[in-house]
Amino acid sequence: GIRVENLQNIPGKTEEDEGKINIGAVLRVTPIKDVKTMIQAFGFAKEKDDRLKLWIMGPWEEDREYAEECFQLVSDMEIPDVVFTGRINIRDYLGRMDVTILTSISEGQPLTILESYAAHKPVIATDVGNCYGLIYGESDDFGAAGIVTHIMNIEEIAQAMLDMAANEKMRLEMGETGYRRVMEKYRVEYMQKTYWEIYRDFAEQMGLEWKEESVKLPDKEK
């Protein structure tokens, strides 16, 4: 779950962002995030819509060799408007984004999608882990909060970028859908309640006594 209040009242766009469609990726620059596919897709999309700007936000020191390959790819393809910020405070940047993106080849339930929703931002994501459920909704009828693409599909990802850039109304509606979804289903308080109910039901099935006040976190090691 996520504490939505931590991403309320964050700074919005600046003069630097005027006339730009900012696409933000909050990640570690590692192979599992498939940053190379993201860069290639952005390069093709940028050729068709010069307003696009890609922000790759997060540490790159974990796999320096891969990071250097990503830097070199941007240089070799001569792609303008790609920014590697390094480690950041997400509150300082997320409000400036028009859309966020995740091109991973493997995920569980990505926190970055929930953070985007908390900031009213739509998401482009590959179909890994629970990304499809987060974007299209598993048990609600709120609608789409973004676009899901196939893994490592440069053409699809580029087209998703272009579709988002071309339709401000769609971006805003998807951002609000994501916010509604995270508020209804993925806040920390909701997740705690959901897990408590699961444990309670399991205890009842096993014939065990269950009291909410008996649930305690383990003491920290001294």
What are these regions (language model features)?
Residues 1-19:
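Acidic anion/phosphate-binding donor-loop and adjacent secondary structure
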Residues 15-33, 39-42, 55:
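Conserved donor-binding/catalytic core segment of Leloir-type glycosyltransferases
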Residues 26, 53-68:
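Glycosyltransferase donor-sugar binding loop
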Residues 67-87:
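Nucleotide-activated donor-binding/catalytic signature segment of Leloir-type glycosyltransferases, i.e.
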Residues 105:
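Aromatic "clamp/platform" in nucleotide-sugar-dependent glycosyltransferases that forms part
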Residues 122-125, 130-135:
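Short hydrophobic beta-strand element within catalytic cores of glycosyltransferases
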Residues 136-154, 163-168:
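Conserved acidic donor-binding segment of nucleotide-sugar-dependent glycosyltransferases
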Residues 163, 170-184, 191-197:
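A short, well-ordered alpha-helix in the C-terminal region of glycosyltransferases
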